[in-house]
Amino acid sequence: METPPVNTIGEKDTSQPQQEWEKNLRENLDSVIQIRQQPRDPPTETLELEVSPDPASQILEHTQGAEKLVAELEGDSHKSHGSTSQMPEALQASDLWYCPDGSFVKKIVIRGHGLDKPKLGSCCRVLALGFPFGSGPPEGWTELTMGVGPWREETWGELIEKCLESMCQGEEAELQLPGHSGPPVRLTLASFTQGRDSWELETSEKEALAREERARGTELFRAGNPEGAARCYGRALRLLLTLPPPGPPERTVLHANLAACQLLLGQPQLAAQSCDRVLEREPGHLKALYRRGVAQAALGNLEKATADLKKVLAIDPKNRAAQEELGKVVIQGKNQDAGLAQGLRKMFG
């Protein structure tokens, strides 16, 4: 994220007229990249739960719906929970931040100071107002520790944590949420203690934190939240990737589980890459072969999909999920051939 210029807390930004802000907003919208891949039917198998040699350090990033959120921000910003006298008279495009997973758009109301942001272990003093959920954060100022504590299990926990990761000390921001027509949520970060980067942690600490993230990811996946699960698996992988090679065998499981999430989220390219990392360490990993086959079919690479699915059936001939997926691939191939033949007849007939 581009860091805005450092201002004193509470200082208003009047560097541009409203017309220039609106122009920059439209230009900023044009730069938003949306992932529009259509998800296939979800795999009929389960996550990898046992330990075996695997993550993609990339966490699925899609910003579908960002344009709609920004339009709502533009129209609803006057409904904020604070006094309008605290609002900057003019904002720049750099004052908008799009959460990579598309869960919200942040508009900076009051810029913070410094360059540091909360990280693992940081104790943050925050004030949150206007959450639409039935049970939001506690009223008044609250202290939350990044990456630790039961607050992360709450409906609002993941959203606040993602936003805090992008904030500087003293920053106040409005969050526009998909499907939320009311006033924007407002979040203020008064202060935070210095946490630790992953390279500062002991090996045992990294492994323990990674196990917690993996367990949380599996809970979210089973609850029907592949996006949240992928975020947990990605965090666990980033912790383990800092360990000396070859790394713990849990990496293979995490990559395989991340691939399952990416398939459900309509990201077959990322899913195939996650499976590649599994198969580099364990060429006969059935679930990785199956998921890569599904991903290749979604990408239209039918020969590669067929090869992976046949490998699964060679190892496990009774694997029903692979049998069904291979049948779909065969039908898809016949339809492609029929379409090509029809096109050639029209061209040369």
Curated annotation (Swiss-Prot):
TPR repeats: 210-243, 252-285, 286-319
Superkingdom as given in the UniProt entry: Eukaryota
UniProt cross-references to Pfam families, sorted A to Z: TPR_1, TPR_16
Effect of residue 291 to A: Abolishes HSP90AB1 binding
Region: Disordered, residue numbers: 36-55
Entry comment describing in which tissues the protein is expressed: Ubiquitously expressed with higher levels in testis.
InterPro entries: FKBP4/5/8-like (IPR050754), TPR-like_helical_dom_sf (IPR011990), TPR_rpt (IPR019734)
Quaternary structure annotation from Swiss-Prot or TrEMBL: Forms a ternary complex with CDKN1A/p21 and HSP90AB1/Hsp90.
Annotated protein name in UniProt: FK506-binding protein-like
Species assigned in the record: Homo sapiens (Human)
Phylogenetic placement of the source organism: Eukaryota, Metazoa, Chordata, Craniata, Vertebrata
